[in-house]
Amino acid sequence: MGQKRQRDSKNLTLHSKKRKKAENATATDSDDGWDGIVGADELNWKEVALPDRLEDAGGFYGLEEIEGVDIVRGSGNGEVKFKAVAGKPKKSILKKKALEDENPEYEEEWSGFSDDDADRPENASSTVVEKPEKSDRKADKKSEKNADKKEAKDAKKKEAKAAKKEQKEKGSAIQRDMSINAGLSFAALQDTEEDDGADVSAWDSLGLSPEILTGLSKMKFGSPTSVQEACIPQILEGHDVIGKASTGSGKTLAFGIPILEHYLEKKRDDISAQKEQMSEKDSTPIALILSPTRELAHQLSKHIGELIAQAPGVNARIALLTGGLSVQKQQRLLSGADIVIGTPGRVWEILSTGQGLIRKMQQIKFLVVDEADRLLSEGHFKEVEEILNSLDRVEDGEVPDGEDQASEEESDPSSERQTLVFSATFHRDLQQKLAGKRKWTRGDIMDKKESMDYLLQKLNFREEKPKFIDMNPISQMADNLKEGIVECGAMEKDLFLYTLLLYHPKHRTLVFTNSISAVRRLTKLLQTLQLPALALHSSMAQKARLRSVERFSSPSSDPSTILIATDVAARGLDIKGIDLVIHYHAPRTADTYVHRSGRTARAGASGKSVIICGPDEMVGVVRLAAKVHANMANGKKLPLESLELDRRVVSRVKPRVSLASRITDANIAKEKISAEDNWLRNAAEDLGVEYDSEEFDESNGKGRGRGRGRHQKQKEVGSVSKAELAGLRAELKQLLSQRVNVGVSERYLTAGRVDIDALLRGEGNTSFLGPVDPLNF
């Protein structure tokens, strides 16, 4: 048997090139004294800034944080170490002292040759390693070249920087002179000559500045409204004001103009005292304007912004804080804002989570509460109370001991702040629900004493008795508003709504409902009937809400556009051209009716408000009329005008509405069934069980629980096939292609009462074939 040859022993000193390279790199790192792992005391910790409003920190004060490190746990002793994450410089996580201790050789780093080297003694210690003579000469020449290049480059940079700075100073000086002497600019004179503004001599009695008068002239506001004429002088004198005026009377500029006047006065004082302009981050707002809805906040910003854009020398910045938009962007806008406009929820969210923002807001000169009855009503807008409390709160230790009484008065946030309150309704009795069997009062809705007491309890006014300015003590509604009521059956509201819309072609119409589901259904119903309908409710995304308002208010849009909305559109929206307001559901409270109807007949224009009233809503409508028109001289039980629709028209359009309702209900039922099915399927997947829709429907139908009949009806409506839906749509399309015949022979048009010439020209109401009497209020 042959003996196996013995293998040579492996030389352990031989390693692969790759391993040698890694070991050399590790050795180099260890030689440098830096392995990237440090203790907690050597890190550059940063203190955590706590928000201004923190209810309970639980003892966590003085917290510190650091970013860009990984935790390295020790092998045996449990000690925790840290190291920089990949891609982050290791020096950035260390303290300066720790950095010097870890890298002492950085202090003696070679920085090139200098003239001091010649004077140094021969035996002096030097960290420069001696090189051969040839390499010294090369390095010397190279360093001289680099030094010359660097000097030339630095000289060029300095020259460019100086020229840029000089140019910037010249530009800022020119801009400053132009802003101060804006009225003397020839370009401004040329612009005013080209654009002839309105005559603003009627504003002279209010004592406004030339800049504001110029802006009002460009905006074509020739004379102030009654509420502006009454409120602006009182606000300019420094009084707290409670303004009560009908909707569409110009309340926005009644408080917007005094705020801008204060801004201009402050700007003049800064220029006369030759103060340096503060940076945006150091500036403090002069006014906070609170609004109950996002749409109203956007509108306030738009109206005040228009006056700022038209008034020369007024560069006030507006920060708009509303929900549905980026919080980070709004925080940046707030840092340099002069006027803050927002809804209570978002304003309080930003103030409570920020650092130093509440202290900034305590220095405002104006607090404006628009639509105050809604913002200050019980059970709504808890954030308003938080905002008001934070503005009036004086923290302990702010006024040091030994200060006199004057300094304590100056430290009171409300001592220098004017409070301005505006709305069309203040009486609390208007906020009671109209429906139900509870006892209701026939009180005067314009009771001044109750309104004053109610507001004095909620708000901290600077004066004991603020100025109460009531511009409509007799009638709560606008003068040019016509009110009417249409009585119908409980299941005929869709039919009468469509008929009312046919009676008012080329009218911009706003339809109010009491629920979001009704908005969705009515929008689809009217779109199925080929009417330009848009939706607006609180569940929509903010961008979609703004898009609906923009499309509805755009002058280039269809004049027959219809906006179906909940009460989010009831307050403050100033949309030009709204001719008709329809209450699909009777309003729950009287103040809601006042604000809904106030969307039309604004600024002296005429408008109509119609309630579609079912049998179950009649009691509430009677109470509504009694509250709103309590001071009417005629003493009628129901002062609303009863409107009678032509029964021929109602019967002719009924097939259209029936077909459209079937199509709409089928589509909604299909969407709802699909959504529920998807939810159940996802829930079954999460639970890890098998989902069978048919088995689930069988088990669901066996019970006798609540909603069983509704689910069964929904399933039946949603079971309509696509072919059946297509047939219904084709039938509806044929009906919509024809005019509604109101008793005219289509074969012998000339024999009837039809105006053929007007028919060919497309004049009159093109929805009907034949004469139809308009609705008389």
UniProtKB/Swiss-Prot annotation:
Its EC number is 3.6.4.13. Belongs to the DEAD box helicase family. DDX24/MAK5 subfamily. Residues 101-119, 395-413 have a biased composition (Acidic residues). This is ATP-dependent RNA helicase mak5. Residues 1-38, 92-176, 392-417, 692-720 are annotated as: Disordered. It is an enzyme of class 3 (hydrolase). GO terms for cellular component: nucleolus. GO terms for molecular function: ATP binding; ATP hydrolysis activity; RNA binding; RNA helicase activity. The keyword Repeat does not apply. The keyword Repeat does not apply. It catalyses: ATP + H2O = ADP + phosphate + H(+). ATP binds at A245, S246, T247, G248, S249, G250, K251, T252. A motif (Q motif) lies at residues 201-229. CDD domains: DEADc_DDX24 (cd17946), SF2_C_DEAD (cd18787). SUPFAM superfamilies: P-loop containing nucleoside triphosphate hydrolases. The Q motif is unique to and characteristic of the DEAD box family of RNA helicases and controls ATP binding and hydrolysis. Keywords: ATP-binding, Helicase, Hydrolase, Nucleotide-binding, Nucleus, Ribosome biogenesis, RNA-binding, rRNA processing. ATP-binding RNA helicase involved in the biogenesis of 60S ribosomal subunits and is required for the normal formation of 25S and 5.8S rRNAs. Residues 703-713 have a biased composition (Basic residues). Residues 496-646 form the Helicase C-terminal domain. One of its GO terms (biological process) is rRNA processing. Residues 1-10, 130-171 have a biased composition (Basic and acidic residues). It is found in: Nucleus, Nucleolus.
